[in-house]
A protein has these predicted regions:
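Mature, structured domains of secreted/extracytosolic soluble proteins
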Residues: 4-6, 19-319
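Sec-dependent bacterial lipoprotein signal peptides
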Residues: 1-17
Length: 319
């Protein structure tokens, strides 16, 4: 088992996107999460990865967890796409954090999934704090970080619950959340506009240990962009000229800083990639741009591996 190899034929098989939800009472499930994984031939790779990283002990205890479990086929595809020939080839600390990105503290049944954010057990390279995971639930179909879908739910265990997923959930960057969260649809459209002379997706995907990461992103929600277009007398994001769009987007990003909401204070001067802004917290957190326009911070501390996102309700504009 030490040099467990990929069966590449798994990758050639098709995936099913329907979700089967088990209806099994936890009281009738004396097996732990680890026992369930060990007992299933579908999770051979996952079981080996858990054993290799020492996480098997965590999932064999009494504390409650929710595990998003990739099957052998899914693990095989992940290894192949990332240039690994076996689980042993994945650096152990990286493998451990990826696995922890599939673990949420507490028991979360399938019916209780709601669109929003939760925290995983994975730790951000930028802060050492737990990372966020975006959950989207539409018509009882659950997608995680915009990439992995639950295909079988509610495999009950004595210490939690298992949901099978059809993709390994990568460690999120700030870009992951911008593209996964429907509240950032307009922002995602803006940062991916083809005529931008700076590749913001590439920049904001930089590893936390490399400059200009980590990042603090003040991310305008969809309503903020709608109101901006009205303010500017424009009909679409495509009507904003490239220089203005570029300077506006970079004005929402602080480089080499992972500023949590707890670190904000009144009259705090912050330097973004596009100029200075001022943070305030009395009466509700907000930021003020160089034109004295105030944007409220409506959600905070969406933690990625390379930075943090705070959601704002108005697009800020540089001088």
């Amino acid at each position: 088992m030490k040099n467990l190899k990929i069966l590449f034929a798994f990758v050639l098989l098709g995936f099913t996107f329907s979700c089967t939800v088990d209806d099994e009472d936890v009281d009738n499930a004396p097996l732990t999460i680890l026992n369930r994984i060990e007992a299933s031939s579908n999770y051979t790779f996952l079981n080996y990865a858990l054993q290799r990283t020492g996480l098997s002990n965590v999932l064999n205890g009494t504390e409650k967890y929710t595990l998003f479990a990739p099957s052998n086929m899914v693990m095989g595809r992940f290894l192949m796409q990332n240039g690994f020939s076996s689980i042993d080839d994945v650096p152990e600390e990286l493998l451990k954090n990826i696995l922890l990105n599939h673990v949420i503290a507490g028991e979360l049944p399938y019916r209780n999934f709601e669109t929003g954010y939760a925290k995983t057990a994975a730790l951000s390279d930028a802060t050492g704090l737990p990372m966020s995971i975006h959950i989207e639930q539409v018509n009882m179909r659950v997608t995680l970080n915009g990439e992995a879908m639950i295909t079988r739910g509610n495999i009950m265990a004595s210490n939690g619950i298992i949901h099978t997923v059809n993709r390994v959930i990568p460690l999120p960057t700030v870009v992951t959340f911008v593209t996964a969260d429907a509240n950032f649809k307009n922002l995602a459209q803006a940062v991916t506009r083809e005529d931008l002379t700076v590749d913001l997706v590439e920049v904001l995907s930089t590893n936390a240990s490399n400059s200009p990461a980590p990042f603090t992103v003040f991310a305008p929600n969809n309503t903020a962009f709608v109101n901006l277009l009205s303010e500017l007398g424009l009909s679409s994001l495509g009507d904003i000229d490239e220089p203005t769009l570029k300077t506006t987007l970079t004005y929402h990003v602080i480089a080499e800083t992972n500023a949590l909401s707890s670190q904000l204070s009144d009259n705090l001067q912050l330097t973004t990639l596009g100029g200075n802004i001022t943070a305030n917290v009395t009466g509700g957190a907000s930021i003020t741009d160089g034109n004295n326009r105030v944007s409220n911070i409506v959600a905070v501390d969406v933690q990625a591996n390379n930075g943090v996102i705070h959601v704002i309700d108005k697009v800020i504009l540089p001088n």
